C-alpha cells in the first residue's frame, strides 16, 4: 500500500498532532545521535513540545555547545558586518565611478567631442538639450542686463535730483562781492604830492649873454662887454 504525501501544514486534530510529534521527535533524536557518532560532530538538539515539555540531546554538553555557538556567532557576525560594510563601500565606489564616467562622456558629447559613436536619435536628443540650454542662458543674460539697466536708471535719477538740489541752493545764496584792494601809495595822496614837489628843483636865476658860456668862467667879463658905456 502506497502512503500518501503528507502536506506541510499544521495538523488541526490535537490527537493526531501529538502522535505525529512523538514519532518525528524520536526520529529526529535518532538522526542527531547517528550524526554525532558517524561524523564525529558536536551536536546539540533542543525540542519543546506543544505543551511546553523539553526534549534534548547533546553529544558533549548542551551548555558548552550553546556557549560555543554564541562565541562563534559573535565573532563571525562582527567580521561579517565589517566585510559587508567593505563590500558595500566598494559597490558604492564602483557605482559612483560609473556615474562619473557617464557624466564625463555626456559632457564631451555636449562639447561636440566623441560624436562618432552617437546615433541619429542621440544626436537629435543632444541638439534639443543644447537648444533648451541656450534658451535658458539667453533668458538669464537678458534678465541680468535688465537689472543693470534699471540700476543705471536709478543712479541717473538720483544724480539729476542731486543736481537740482545744488541748483536751488546756488539760487538762494547771495552773490559774492569783489574784494576791495587799496594800494599803499593811494592811502595818503598828500604824501605823494609832497614827495613829488620835494624831488622837483627849478632854477630861477637870469643869465644874460650868449648861450653856451658858463657863468663861472666869464660871467663878469661878459656883463662888462655887453653893457654900453655911458
UniProtKB/Swiss-Prot annotation:
Gene3D superfamilies: Transcription factor, MADS-box. SMART domains: MADS. Residues 209-230 are annotated as: Disordered. GO terms for biological process: cell differentiation; flower development; positive regulation of transcription by RNA polymerase II; regulation of transcription by RNA polymerase II. Residues 86-176 form the K-box domain. Transmembrane segments: none annotated. Its main location: nucleus. Expressed in mature leaves and at low levels in roots and young panicles. It comes from the Eukaryota. The keyword Transcription regulation applies. GO terms for molecular function: DNA-binding transcription factor activity, RNA polymerase II-specific; protein dimerization activity; RNA polymerase II cis-regulatory region sequence-specific DNA binding. Keywords: Activator, Developmental protein, Differentiation, DNA-binding, Flowering, Nucleus, Transcription, Transcription regulation. InterPro entries: MADS-box/MEF2_TF, MEF2-like_N, TF_Kbox, TF_MADSbox, TF_MADSbox_sf. Disruption phenotype: Late-flowering phenotype and elongated internodes. GO terms for cellular component: nucleus. Residues 1-61 form the MADS-box domain. It is found in: Nucleus. Early flowering phenotype is observed in overexpressing plants. Probable transcription factor active in flowering time control. May control internode elongation and promote floral transition phase. May act upstream of the floral regulators MADS1, MADS14, MADS15 and MADS18 in the floral induction pathway. This is MADS-box transcription factor 50.
Amino acid at each position: 500500500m502506497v502512503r500518501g504525501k503528507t502536506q506541510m501544514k499544521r495538523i488541526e486534530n490535537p490527537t493526531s498532532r501529538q502522535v505525529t510529534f512523538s514519532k518525528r521527535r524520536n526520529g529526529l533524536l535518532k538522526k542527531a545521535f547517528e550524526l554525532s557518532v558517524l561524523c564525529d560532530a558536536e551536536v546539540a538538539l533542543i525540542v519543546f513540545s506543544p505543551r511546553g515539555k523539553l526534549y534534548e540531546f547533546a553529544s558533549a554538553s548542551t551548555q558548552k555547545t550553546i556557549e560555543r555557538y554564541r562565541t562563534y556567532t559573535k565573532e563571525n557576525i562582527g567580521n561579517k558586518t565589517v566585510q559587508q560594510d567593505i563590500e558595500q563601500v566598494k559597490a558604492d565606489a564602483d557605482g559612483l565611478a560609473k556615474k562619473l564616467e557617464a557624466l564625463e562622456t555626456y559632457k564631451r558629447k555636449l562639447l561636440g567631442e566623441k560624436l562618432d559613436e552617437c546615433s541619429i536619435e542621440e544626436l537629435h536628443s543632444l541638439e534639443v538639450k543644447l537648444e533648451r540650454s541656450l534658451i535658458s542662458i539667453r533668458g538669464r543674460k537678458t534678465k541680468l542686463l535688465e537689472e543693470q539697466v534699471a540700476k543705471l536708471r536709478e543712479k541717473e535719477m538720483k544724480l539729476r535730483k542731486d543736481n537740482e538740489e545744488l541748483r536751488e541752493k546756488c539760487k538762494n545764496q547771495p552773490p559774492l562781492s569783489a574784494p576791495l584792494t587799496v594800494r599803499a601809495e593811494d592811502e595818503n595822496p598828500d604824501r605823494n604830492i609832497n614827495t613829488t614837489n620835494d624831488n622837483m628843483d627849478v632854477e630861477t636865476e637870469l643869465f644874460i649873454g650868449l648861450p653856451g658860456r658858463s657863468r663861472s668862467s666869464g660871467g663878469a667879463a661878459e656883463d662888462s662887454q655887453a653893457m654900453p658905456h655911458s
